[in-house]
Every structure is written in structure tokens, then in C-alpha cells.
Amino acid sequence: SNRHQDQVCLIGAKDSYHSTYSQVCEVAVPDARFNDKDQLTYQPVPFATLLDGLRDSFSAALDCEPVAEDYALSNQGQELYGMMTWRLPESEHSGLALALRSSYNSSIAPAFGVGEAVFVCANGSFSVDGMIKSARQTTNVMETLRELTRDVSSTAISDFRAMAEETAGWRDVAVKDDLFYAYCGLLFGRKVISSQLFSTAIKYWNACRDGSLHREHATENLWSAYQAVTAAMQRSGPRDSFRGYGGLHHVTRAVFNSGGCVEGSSQIPSLDVEAAMRVATN
């Protein structure tokens, strides 16, 4: 599996460091704060409570334990960033990843998001191709988090399973170099990826093809094309990839609908992104 998908990034995050679960749990939990009327204004969620709650809830809903957990602490241990990944029977090639962040210094409310491609960085960057939920650390924050977790674990898992089913078919669609360049061009033109990501995706595709990078992404098919773009998106650590991942799906679906390259030919088939978008919104 791609190790960078299961790791928390430290790019541009000074004084941050990778941490074990026990190191995260050792950080002292600050006291709750009250105003002069004795009303609760800040109720910290212990990092251990957040992690255990998310892990238990998702593991129960998925009926399996996570295969990887990665954490980073920043700002003298006051900010937490992490990722948990589960492998599901529906998809041997991709995991369901949960990215999370929280803090003890009021800088970040506890938030988590799930999807097939997620990115979390200790500099605050956070992007998910699924949904993100956040809870302010005030009254009832624990109950709010419990409700959010229940809601997300059930919805996200059914979304992921549908997605895994769809992407499985992408391996049967041939994508030659020229179609991949056209695919990236559409993504760039539609503002799904930047010019820098365009260039990174092409480099990733070429590196996989010449054997210097992931062998399993070297096959000339739509799955490898999609992986090249998500790898580029993850490496850049975009702050807001919601629009990005949504747009990526529409364009990928358009390539799938075209049938891809015909065997023995590198001709680019006609692509109808608008039709793929209409299907997605119906």
C-alpha cells in the first residue's frame, strides 16, 4: 500500500513531531474554563477520549480493526493531527481513512473527516474526499462528538462501499499516455488541480510507468490514472480539496463512460464531463 496515504505530514509545521498513541495520551489535559457567571466556556476533549471514541465507533461499524494509526503533535503538544486507516473486504486496493485534528489551546476544534483519499498535515492542512464534521469545545461537546461519529461512520461507510464498487471497474478501462494527459488537462482546465499538481501528476504517472515508483500503479488503466492525480493532491496538502475531489470524480467518471482507449490504439475517445456530472447530481 502507499505509505504516504497512511501518514501524517509535517511539511511547514515547525516544532511538530510524529507521536505514538501513548505519547498523545500523556499530554496533560487543560482545565475546563468558566466565565464570571460560572457558565462553562471551554470543555476540553481529552485526546485519548477523541481517538478511542473514533476508533471504537468506526471499527464497530466496519467490523474490523484499523491497519494503521499515525499521529503528530505540534505547538508543544497542544495540537493533535492524526490518521486511522481500515482495509475493507470490498476493496483490497484502497482503505477507508479517517483524518482528525484537535487542540488543547483552543486553536482548533475537534474535527474529523473520512474518505478514500485523505490528507492531514500538522501545519493545519486537511483535505478529505468524503465529509468533515467539527464540534466546538463548549457545553455538550462529548455528546455532539458521539452523535457526529455515529452519523459519519454509517454514512461514510456506505459511501465508501459504493465508491469501492465503482472504482473496481476503473481497472478495466485502458488509459494510454495521451488519454492521461487529456484527463489531467480537463482537471486543470476545470480548476480541479493547479498547474503545479498537473505537473506532479504527470511526473508520478511517468515514474510509475518507468518502474521507479509504485509498480502496482504502472498498469495503463483508469485506476492508475486516478491514483496519479490523488497522489499529487495529497502531496501538496491542499487546504480545501472538497471541490477538487468532487471534480476529480466527475472527470474520472467521464473517462470511464467513454470506455477508454481501444486495444492497440492510443486514440483519445470523446469525453463528456457534463453528462457525468448530471448523473452524479441525479
Segments predicted by a language model, with ranges:
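A short acidic/basic microdomain associated with nuclease active sites
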Residues: S59-W86
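Residues at beta-strand starts and edge strands
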Residues: P46, Q78-L80, S94
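Feature for intrinsically disordered/low-complexity regulatory segments and propeptides
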Residues: S1-G53, S57-D63
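Intrinsic-disorder/low-complexity coil detector
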Residues: V29, Q43-V45, E65, L88, ...
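Intrinsically disordered, low-complexity regions enriched in serine/threonine
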Residues: S1-V8, A13, Y71-A72, R87-N282
